[in-house]
C-alpha cells in the first residue's frame, strides 16, 4: 500500500503548522494514519542541521552552503521518516519541502533553478509530493505575524525584497502545475482558511483511495 505525500508551503507567518495540525485531525477522525513532520528537520540529525540553518551567526552562510545543508537534511528525512511512512500507507503532512528550496534558495537567494533541480533528482529520485498546499498572503502581513511570535530566526531577518521573491516563486510554481498545487488565501480569518481545507478533504481521500 502506498500512502499520500502532502506538503504545506508558504512564506513566514502563513499558518502552515496550525493548518497542518488541523488537517491531520480531520484525517485522523476518519481513521487514517497521519505522519506529521517538517523541513528542515524531521529526524534528530536533520533537526540539528535545522539549528545550523536557522540560528543567526556572525559568520555569513554562503548560499550554496545553505542549499547543500537543506538537501542533506532532506536526504536524512526521506530515509528516516517520509519513505517509511508512505510505505506503511500513511498520509504524510510535511511543513515545507523542496518547493521551499526553490522559493528561498532559488527565488530569495538567486541560485539557479537547474542547480536545485539536479540536487532534487539526486536526493529524491522520482519522489515528488502528491499535493502541495500553498498558503499565500501579502509579505507585510506574514512578517508582522512572524515578528509577533518573538525572536526572529536567520531567514525571518531577511528584507522585504527577499520575501517578495519567495512569494512570487511559490505562485509561479503553483501556476505551472495546477494539478499538484492548491493555493489558499492565508490572509483570511483562520476559520475561513480551514473551511477551505475541509473542501479539499474529499479530493485528498479520493487520491488516497485511488
Curated annotation (Swiss-Prot):
<keyword id="KW-0547">Nucleotide-binding</keyword>
<comment type="similarity">
    <text>Belongs to the thymidylate kinase family.</text>
</comment>
<protein>
    <recommendedName>
        <fullName>Thymidylate kinase</fullName>
        <ecNumber>2.7.4.9</ecNumber>
    </recommendedName>
</protein>
<keyword id="KW-0067">ATP-binding</keyword>
<dbReference type="GO" id="GO:0004798">
    <property type="term" value="F:dTMP kinase activity"/>
</dbReference>
<dbReference type="GO" id="GO:0006235">
    <property type="term" value="P:dTTP biosynthetic process"/>
</dbReference>
<dbReference type="GO" id="GO:0005737">
    <property type="term" value="C:cytoplasm"/>
</dbReference>
<dbReference type="GO" id="GO:0005524">
    <property type="term" value="F:ATP binding"/>
</dbReference>
<dbReference type="Pfam" id="PF02223">
    <property type="entry name" value="Thymidylate_kin"/>
</dbReference>
<dbReference type="InterPro" id="IPR039430">
    <property type="entry name" value="Thymidylate_kin-like_dom"/>
</dbReference>
<feature type="binding site">
    <location>
        <begin position="10"/>
        <end position="17"/>
    </location>
    <ligand>
        <name>ATP</name>
    </ligand>
</feature>
<keyword id="KW-0545">Nucleotide biosynthesis</keyword>
<dbReference type="InterPro" id="IPR027417">
    <property type="entry name" value="P-loop_NTPase"/>
</dbReference>
<comment type="function">
    <text>Phosphorylation of dTMP to form dTDP in both de novo and salvage pathways of dTTP synthesis.</text>
</comment>
<keyword id="KW-0418">Kinase</keyword>
<keyword id="KW-0808">Transferase</keyword>
<dbReference type="InterPro" id="IPR018094">
    <property type="entry name" value="Thymidylate_kinase"/>
</dbReference>
<dbReference type="GO" id="GO:0006227">
    <property type="term" value="P:dUDP biosynthetic process"/>
</dbReference>
<dbReference type="GO" id="GO:0005829">
    <property type="term" value="C:cytosol"/>
</dbReference>
<dbReference type="GO" id="GO:0006233">
    <property type="term" value="P:dTDP biosynthetic process"/>
</dbReference>
Amino acid at each position: 500500500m502506498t500512502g499520500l505525500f502532502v506538503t504545506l508551503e508558504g512564506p513566514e507567518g502563513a499558518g502552515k503548522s496550525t493548518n497542518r495540525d488541523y488537517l491531520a485531525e480531520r484525517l485522523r477522525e476518519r481513521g487514517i494514519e497521519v505522519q506529521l513532520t517538517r523541513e528542515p528537520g524531521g529526524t534528530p540529525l536533520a533537526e540539528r542541521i535545522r539549528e545550523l540553518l536557522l540560528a543567526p551567526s556572525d559568520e555569513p552562510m554562503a548560499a550554496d552552503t545553505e542549499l547543500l545543508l537543506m538537501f542533506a537534511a532532506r536526504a536524512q528525512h526521506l530515509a528516516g521518516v517520509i519513505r517509511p511512512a508512505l510505505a506503511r500507507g500513511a498520509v504524510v503532512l510535511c511543513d515545507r519541502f523542496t518547493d521551499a528550496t526553490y522559493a528561498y534558495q532559488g527565488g530569495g537567494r538567486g541560485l539557479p533553478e537547474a542547480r536545485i533541480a539536479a540536487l532534487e533528482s539526486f536526493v529524491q529520485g522520482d519522489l515528488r509530493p502528491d499535493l502541495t498546499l500553498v498558503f499565500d498572503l501579502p509579505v507585510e502581513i506574514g512578517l508582522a505575524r512572524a515578528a509577533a511570535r518573538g525572536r526572529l530566526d536567520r531567514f525571518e531577518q531577511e528584507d522585504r525584497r527577499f520575501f517578495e521573491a519567495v512569494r512570487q516563486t511559490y505562485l509561479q510554481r503553483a501556476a505551472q502545475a495546477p494539478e499538484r498545487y492548491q493555493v489558499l488565501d492565508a490572509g483570511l480569518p483562520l476559520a475561513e482558511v480551514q473551511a477551505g481545507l475541509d473542501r479539499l478533504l474529499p479530493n485528498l481521500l479520493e487520491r488516497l483511495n485511488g
